[in-house]
From Swiss-Prot:
CC terms in the record's Gene Ontology section: mitochondrial inner membrane
Subunit structure: Component of the cytochrome c oxidase (complex IV, CIV), a multisubunit enzyme composed of a catalytic core of 3 subunits and several supernumerary subunits. The complex exists as a monomer or a dimer and forms supercomplexes (SCs) in the inner mitochondrial membrane with ubiquinol-cytochrome c oxidoreductase (cytochrome b-c1 complex, complex III, CIII).
Highest taxon, organism lineage: Eukaryota
Membrane topology: Multi-pass membrane protein
Transmembrane segments: 27-51, 63-81
Protein name: Cytochrome c oxidase subunit 2
GO molecular function: copper ion binding; cytochrome-c oxidase activity
Binding site for Cu cation A2: 196, 198, 200, 204
Upper lineage: Eukaryota, Metazoa, Ecdysozoa, Arthropoda, Hexapoda
Stated family: Belongs to the cytochrome c oxidase subunit 2 family.
Amino acid sequence: MATWSNFNLQNSASPLMEQIIFFHDHTLVILIMITILVGYLMISLFFNSYINRFLLEGQMIELIWTILPAITLIFIALPSLRLLYLLDELNNPLITLKSIGHQWYWSYEYSDFQNIQFDSYMIPINEMKNNNFRLLDVDNRIVLPMNNQIRILVTATDVIHSWTIPSLGVKVDANPGRLNQTNFFINRPGIFYGQCSEICGANHSFMPIVIESISIKNFINWINNYS
């Protein structure tokens, strides 16, 4: 989850998020290099006294400043396209989770198991415990097994919502009458927080998402106890 004075992305909990962080750093390096180059040229032109009143065209310099930006864009576009296709790829998910957005809470259904569905509301401030996080904890967490491919189906019943877990690199719009899907792979145990990322009304800020990642053995025990 995000913490105070954290200017970076959240710590990765999935391979896709690691790739997103790598692409962010890769693009940022290119932007810094461009900024330094342009800044150096502007400062050098400002302080030198070279002029050429008879310069009407320069095919070579025009060729250079056309080819170099094109090459730079290719270095950004290729890893971006690779990552885009990785985010859309589904690889034999172990379980399917269905998430339904409401004003202003989430409900979940484990489609592979019978009678496992629940609503997830934010814990009000006056009911919080010492180990709860303000505006982030819920009464019913999503429990999922780590080190397994998971598919999530997302929809809504009223307005557009967005199901988002930053540390997993997942953000899916929940549209009424439409079923969107994506997949993720949690590679470590822990509790991961997210929030609705689409303005959906007065209490938009009060519909958090919490995933509890556990081992497959504990997940099976949870399924049996819930049933």
